[in-house]
């Protein structure tokens, strides 16, 4: 049984990674500038497939923003490393502001502080990669402050709730039919 479980997990992750890599390839072909191919190749051994996919989605939004606001006569696929190097920290701050309410793929979207922070992380990682390689001379993304995220309050059970939870877990009373099936295992 354990061997079967391990094989199933491997198949799940392998299948998921294959699908994610296909999505990344599609984004590289259809929505991202050509220099992004080098970037994603360069970070492949350093990041998980899921991270790269999220970065690809976030960079699509970033390059769409650049083409709308800074390079209106260009499409994302036409951008060059010279265009990237010309992006200022002010441009990136405008991007973060833009994320408060923007149109992408025909939808109106918004981002909260954690989402803005993640998108900034994707942009910073890309700038850092090209800066470290010597392809750009200035890493302006490093100059941009990270959006402040509110700390979430820790939710705790009171003594009665803990007691009730343990009682239900031990006895199974009050569970749905579906939950009872798991409880009986």
Residue locations for each model-derived region?
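Conserved catalytic core of the tyrosine transesterase superfamily
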Residues: 4-185
């Amino acid at each position: 049984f354990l061997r079967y479980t391990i094989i199933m997990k491997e198949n799940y992750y392998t299948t998921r990674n294959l699908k994610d890599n296909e999505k990344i390839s599609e984004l590289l072909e259809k929505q991202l500038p050509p220099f992004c191919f080098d970037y994603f190749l360069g970070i492949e051994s350093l990041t998980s497939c899921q991270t790269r996919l999220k970065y690809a989605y976030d960079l699509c939004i970033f390059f769409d923003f650049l083409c709308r606001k800074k390079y209106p006569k260009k499409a994302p696929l036409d951008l060059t490393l010279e265009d990237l190097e010309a992006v200022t920290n002010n441009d990136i701050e405008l991007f973060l502001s833009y994320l408060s309410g923007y149109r992408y793929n025909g939808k109106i979207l918004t981002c909260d502080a954690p989402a803005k922070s993640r998108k900034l992380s994707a942009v910073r990682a890309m700038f850092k990669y090209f800066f470290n390689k010597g392809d750009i001379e200035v890493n302006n993304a490093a100059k941009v402050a990270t959006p402040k995220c509110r700390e979430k309050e820790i939710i705790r059970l009171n003594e009665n709730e803990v007691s009730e939870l343990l009682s239900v877990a031990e006895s199974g009373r009050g569970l749905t039919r579906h939950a009872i099936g798991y409880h009986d295992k």
